[in-house]
Amino acid sequence: MSGNKDKSKRGRSNKLPFILMGGHICVDVAQGGLASVLPFLVIQSGFSYTEITALVLASNVASAVIQPLFGLMGDKKARPWLMSVGVALAGLGIALVGVLQSYWLVVLAAMVSGIGNAMLHPEGARLAYLAGGDDKAMSMSIFSVGGQIGFCLGPIISVAAVTAFGLSGTLVYLALCLPYALVLLALSRRFLAFGVRGGGSLAGRGKRDRWGAFGVVLGALSVRSIVFYGVTSFFPLYLVATFNAAEDSASLLITVFSIFGAMATASAGFASRRVPAPRLMIGCFVLMVASLASFLLSGSVWLCVAAVMVLAMCLNLFNPPAVALAQEYLPEHLGTASGLAFGVAVAVGGIASPMLGALGDSAGLASAIWVLAALAAAGLAFSLGVAAIERRGARKG
């Protein structure tokens, strides 16, 4: 009888990562859709390029900087209501971006959307980790792929809605996000049952935080973020400048990158069952260095596209297991670990991107991409460090 109860409980827990994935889709639909609203703001509201760039920066900074704070709140007391409020604010913020007239109110609305995004990630990732049971990397993979689905759907929804209804079409995000916020709110009691850290012990490890080990994983995740931003920012421009590719054709490269990245994220949980996270990280960074070099040296558009496919797989295949490992290193601060992994690591990529852009302006895009290859080599060094930490832990265990 008790065996049936355990099986039923596991079944309910196994559904929770998909429910959390839905929340992740909602907040990243809003964040992904913001960029596609910008051209309409320039044309219909008369904002300058500088003003709309500041708009995106305000949203991203608000999201990235405040995420660890919400993670710390979750470490002190389980607050699953943060997710429902976060989904509601993410949708409300971008909905108001299209209807407000004052520029500074639009900036404030973008920041509200970013804060909503920040509210979901730490608590959602913490609960995905706890709901994962013995297969935490799979649970994190399910949660993470929601973000990529959201980023893919956001631009489609924004363009379709604003084209059909004008800037007030952004109100569609209320219809998307508010109902799901209510779903998450209704499930708060079930989420509360996991507590702050869950009831189980960490297999093969003590329960003390290991900040040094966490920092090494965070270094690898930060490198991943910089390379990710670099690929999406510079690779289409490189194809246009080097091979005279049409701008719309070069932009399709990002679609290919997104599709293969989503496939890799969805496969990450299965990969982690066969390959330990440190080995997966090492393999991905080795292929990353090779792919970046191949992109520059190939001399063929199609080989460049193939290199981008491999890069997309490498950048996303190791990410959910690495985030789960980072959380495992901070068992007493799961929310903080989640906030740093999803917030600060991503912010590093956003901060580095303009610096790489300045290098591209002064020394050429190829130089910027070679820097990405060097950074990927640094990511390999971080990954080797993680593997060494795991070996030491195994010997002590």
Across the structure, where does each feature detected by a protein language model lie?
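Helix-loop-helix hairpin linking two adjacent transmembrane segments in secondary transporters
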Residues: 143-190
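Helix-to-loop junctions at the C-terminal end of transmembrane segments
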Residues: 66-78, 264-276, 360-361
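Structural signature of the two symmetry-related core transmembrane helices
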Residues: 81-95, 279-293, 373
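Extracytoplasmic gate region of multi-pass secondary transporters
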Residues: 34-35, 212-262
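Residue-level signature of mid-helix packing/kink "hotspots" within the transmembrane helices
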Residues: 32, 60-68, 151-152, 258-266, ...
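Cytoplasmic helix-loop-helix junction between adjacent transmembrane helices
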Residues: 109-146
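Conserved MFS/SLC helix-loop-helix module at the cytosolic interface between two early adjacent transmembrane helices
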Residues: 65-101
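C-terminal transmembrane helical hairpin of 12-TM major facilitator-type secondary transporters
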Residues: 276-322
